[in-house]
Amino acid sequence: MTEVKHRTYSSLEPDAEYSGDLKDGKKHGHGTLIFNDGTKYVGEFKDNVIHGHGTLTYADGDVYVGGFSEDTEHGHCTFNWADGDEYIGEVKMGDRDGIGIFKFANGSVYSGEWKNNVYEGRGEYTTPNGSKYIGEYKDGERSGNGSSVWVSGHKYKGEYKGDELCGQGTFTFSDGSTVTGEWRDSKLNGYAIRYDAAGNIIQKGIYKDNEWLHDKVN
């Protein structure tokens, strides 16, 4: 899958020029910060820190619009990268955390749950050519129960682990025939039964790395 970017306000150099509201000598209310590299923040401040809603425009053209809490991105946001990537969703203390959509410049889209900047929980991933996965993620990888549909017409429904078909699952070919059984590393490993498009058993037995070890014809 396409690599997901990450960038936060805390990575900026501390030196910046401020213009805006003050309270008791502190930045408080609405104001603008301009950093030495040309990065600019326009938005709300509280007790001398960025807090509330604002827009952070990096010198290279990346733009964050959304919530902040004590100098850290927090709440709902839209983050547009100069190269065309876009994230719309929740952030928690600088990390994508909660529900969000990441639209990649190449046309891939992930929509679903996040934790600590990676896909975590339930989500949907669509590739530029229209292939799609819907199911569970763990640590940024497909893990748990899910289903995939490829542009070729092939389908899979079952278990995943570490971004691979792993566990029990059914693979449906574009011609309507199916194979149901045990998978590991996206290959049949274990007992499986193959059916034709009408549902008749063609073959059943033990597979290893997609090769039959023991063939039993019904």
Where are these regions (language model features)?
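Glycine/tyrosine- and acidic-biased, solvent-exposed loop/turn segments at the edges of beta-strands
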Residues: 1-218
